[in-house]
């Protein structure tokens, strides 16, 4: 299974794709406008040459986007981050809830709680326990916990663009073992949830492993990729650290 190195490699590759996308899109649009201007002025030769340049840039961009989409469709293996010891639900909760920057924790029941962490970003972490994972049961459990936490700690859903871009949600599920349902849940590509204004990252802890969904081939903006990378680093560092030592950002 791919691990932390592959995760960060795929994040970097997605950022490079975004940069290449922007660099190709700008000259393509500029060439198109020039071609239109030449055509309007009656200079058909220059218009044809400029249109050809535009077609080249557009063709390269389309090829890159198709390659990115193919990688996204082929990325079905989740990332496995090693942990120093096996974790159960209570020890996971203790590691997260004692982190620097925790603003509040709401205990919904013995298997679900929500906590808010303010640091580089504003994280809302749902801590859920599913001995045997079920996607429908997990969704119902998460929705119930979020509704209860929203009543106890109301927060505005909208805001300035920079405020929204600084928020992220982490759904951290603790399971006793990996079953087919959990493999499908964590194996689902992160693209759709990362594309939301307040991006969502699904994670799971099973024994001495932290599992994260694939991001290979992602086509999302830089802030969303940064939130994904920072969220993974936050949870992994909290679970790897000695509770008596300060957290070290990865």
Model-identified regions with their sequence ranges:
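Juxtamembrane interface helix immediately N-terminal to a transmembrane segment
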Residues: 3-27
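N-terminal topogenic membrane-targeting module
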Residues: 2-4, 60-125
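Hydrophobic alpha-helical transmembrane segments
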Residues: 39-54
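Catalytic cores of nucleic-acid endonucleases
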Residues: 131-191
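Charged, structured surface patches that assemble and position nucleic-acid processing machinery
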Residues: 188-250
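Short, flexible beta-strand-to-coil junctions
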Residues: 118-123, 128-134, 174-178, 207-208
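Core hydrophobic alpha-helical transmembrane segments of single-pass membrane proteins
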Residues: 30-31, 52-56
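N-terminal signal sequences
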Residues: 25-38
């Amino acid at each position: 299974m791919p691990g932390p190195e592959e995760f960060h490699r795929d994040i970097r590759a997605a950022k490079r794709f975004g940069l290449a996308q922007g660099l190709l899109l700008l000259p393509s649009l500029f060439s198109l406008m020039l071609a239109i201007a030449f055509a309007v002025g009656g200079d058909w030769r220059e218009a044809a040459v400029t249109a050809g340049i535009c077609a080249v840039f557009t063709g390269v961009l389309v090829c890159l986007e198709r390659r990115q989409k193919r990688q996204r469709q082929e990325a079905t293996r989740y990332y496995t981050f090693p942990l120093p010891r096996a974790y159960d639900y209570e020890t996971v909760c203790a590691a997260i809830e004692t982190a620097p920057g925790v603003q509040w924790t709401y205990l919904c029941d013995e298997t679900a709680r929500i906590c808010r962490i303010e640091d580089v970003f504003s994280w809302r972490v749902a801590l859920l326990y599913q001995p045997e994972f079920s996607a429908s049961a997990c969704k119902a459990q998460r929705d119930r916990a979020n509704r209860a936490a929203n009543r106890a700690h109301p927060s505005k859903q909208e805001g300035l663009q920079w405020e929204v871009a600084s928020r992220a949600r982490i759904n951290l599920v603790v399971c006793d073992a990996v079953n087919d349902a959990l493999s499908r849940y964590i194996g689902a590509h992160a693209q759709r949830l990362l594309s939301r204004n307040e991006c969502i990252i699904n994670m799971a802890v099973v024994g001495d492993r932290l599992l994260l969904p694939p991001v290979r081939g992602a086509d999302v903006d830089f802030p969303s990729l940064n939130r994904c990378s920072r969220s993974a680093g936050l949870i992994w560092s909290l679970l790897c650290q000695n509770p008596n030592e300060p957290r070290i950002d990865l």
